[in-house]
């Protein structure tokens, strides 16, 4: 396994991470098989695991907590995402911060995710949908900074809408976030135009979502 520095956090994470969406009560999913798969990835050197409350209403977060506790001697990095209050993906232009991430909702779901996983803190907490215009109402990001300072998580990230890499550039350039998750593979390379240069400039980590196009590129 090769490792990379995760932006300005300076974490040394495996360049191949584990996305846990498929472990959220999908048809045919099995908890024992999921845990075996997670453990094999740890044994092979994977150290970065990405989940979300929206993956089975916390089901996937619970599995992540189990694999963390099963490997107490290893530093495994935990990333999860808060759902929008209206539970609608992706975000739309007309959605306001209060529709999706009012401060009380953020605090509630950060604590729900911690309880689901049985962890005291996450390494990375992400907005599961994002609109750059939400920066105009800083209550959401300020609540995240407050919870980060309380030690509930250690870095802040955003997960961008499909085909909208430009819709996170303001957040990246604000200096308020530590990572951005965006679709990037041989079919969709738009993030290279503006988003990736902004991330390099601000030392913001990039998480490539569906790098194999949800299995299309694996044969």
Show which residues each predicted segment covers.
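Conserved, mostly hydrophobic/aromatic
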Residues: 6, 18, 34, 41, ...
